[in-house]
Amino acid sequence: MDQDQHPQYGIPELRQLMKGGGRTTTTTPSTSSHFPSDFFGFNLAPVQPPPHRLHQFTTDQDMGFLPRGIHGLGGGSSTAGNNSNLNASTSGGGVGFSGFLDGGGFGSGVGGDGGGTGRWPRQETLTLLEIRSRLDHKFKEANQKGPLWDEVSRIMSEEHGYQRSGKKCREKFENLYKYYRKTKEGKAGRQDGKHYRFFRQLEALYGDSNNLVSCPNHNTQFMSSALHGFHTQNPMNVTTTTSNIHNVDSVHGFHQSLSLSNNYNSSELELMTSSSEGNDSSSRRKKRSWKAKIKEFIDTNMKRLIERQDVWLEKLTKVIEDKEEQRMMKEEEWRKIEAARIDKEHLFWAKERARMEARDVAVIEALQYLTGKPLIKPLCSSPEERTNGNNEIRNNSETQNENGSDQTMTNNVCVKGSSSCWGEQEILKLMEIRTSMDSTFQEILGGCSDEFLWEEIAAKLIQLGFDQRSALLCKEKWEWISNGMRKEKKQINKKRKDNSSSCGVYYPRNEENPIYNNRESGYNDNDPHQINEQGNVGSSTSNANANANVTTGNPSGAMAASTNCFPFFMGDGDQNLWESYGLRLSKEENQ
């Protein structure tokens, strides 16, 4: 700042002020003279300044330190222990000695040595550090530091009488620690060489105290600022008492006070600078804490999800096992029901077959009763019965030669035995099924093979309770029946004389058949041409027996061969003997 704006002093005035002999002197600033530049330490005499000696004084405020030079300016002697009153009158915004003494000047904001409402005196700061070091083990173990700082505040209030909240204590300690770290790491950037005032206490708490470095150096820039603040724009009246202090000591004491204020201002500025770095470290800790909370939250949710998935998988497995057991039980029950149904169906067809066999036996007995001669059972229900039937047929064909009717019956049974024992009912059912499927056979005529149709016919015969027949046997049987039908129709068309014997196989008759119309047979055993055509129907044994009867002149055998008993069964008129056995003769094919 420009020096012309402040009161100017010369060397004589300064010496007179320093050597005042106990009288009150009023000094009026002069506008013509200035403080010389050598007063600031540039051109002083080469006298080594004594060590800094600070004299403690007591005021209405807290404890403070007054440099010796400033004390001398106040008019009091250090040896006599007299109190001095320094009155400075200012106009505008100037700063006097009173503002410097009560902490409102250069040293008011450094570390809180002032005694105001928001300031921390040195003794209170030392008390805070002592309590904090005493509770250091609790701070290291606790996660939440807030209750511990409340405990520090309570101890300071109860034991030492300082009223500070836990939050203020924590903020003060953080500022002290931040500046301590910067000082220890050499980042404080101090030029006066003064170490931090609370470095020893913090070093005992956080590290070794061997790094204490003190390098005395004067900061001329801040000293000039202090001297500049010492001046005011208006005239200043200073009332002093006499003093026996030398001029050199007074000037050096004043210079020492300026250095002390420089230390205070420097410490305060560095603490304010370090507060921003402390905020950064606090934000980093909060960020790390936030990341840890997020990680813990995700881990907790993942554990819950895995546990829920395990429970769900266990339930799903149990449900699948229960469903599988139910399915197996239902399948087993269905198998039992199906087996029972098949057994019931087999039993039904067995009863039906037994009923049909009983009916056939009744018919045979009726024929035996009417003819008065024994007949051979036409149906063979088992291989043993088939073998026995064939043997009986051979025996009867050899022994029974008395009449032609016996020989005709034998021939009929032999035909049935030679045709793998096809019964009359079985032949009728074969013809019925084949006739019902005639349209299907016509559709595939000239196309694909009809083997599957004959297999279907054989399966239907098995379902009706007959013996198992292959599709080839059914087809051959049908062709054999068809050939016989065609030949019989030819004989009917020729109107031959009726004969008592037939082809040995029951054929369904139509309206053109003379058996129903004229009660005549279309077959003649005496016709050699017809015998040759029906060689598959007749047997060589029956032909030999018939020829033997005719040759030997046995008229009864010849008559028996040429006599038909069908008119006898039909009876005279509208009555017939079939009805007495519950049978009814019909012209339809399926009866």
Swiss-Prot record:
Keyword DNA-binding recorded: yes
Bias type Polar residues, positions: 388-410, 515-534
Record region (Disordered): 1-32, 380-410, 491-551
Domain Myb-like: residue ranges: 118-177, 422-479
Signal peptide (UniProt feature, chain positions): none
Transmembrane stretches, start-end: none
GO molecular function, one term: DNA-binding transcription factor activity
GO terms classed as biological process: establishment of petal orientation; negative regulation of organ growth; perianth development; petal development; regulation of DNA-templated transcription; regulation of flower development; sepal development
Biased composition (Low complexity): 535-551
GO cellular component, one term: nucleus
Description of how the protein assembles with itself and partners: Interacts with KIN10.
Function: Transcription factor that prevents growth. Regulates perianth architecture in flower, mostly in the second whorl, probably by suppressing growth between initiating sepals, ensuring that they remain separate, and by modulating organ shapes. Required for the establishment of auxin flux.
Protein name: Trihelix transcription factor PTL
Record lineage: Eukaryota, Viridiplantae, Streptophyta, Embryophyta, Tracheophyta
Gene it is expressed from: PTL
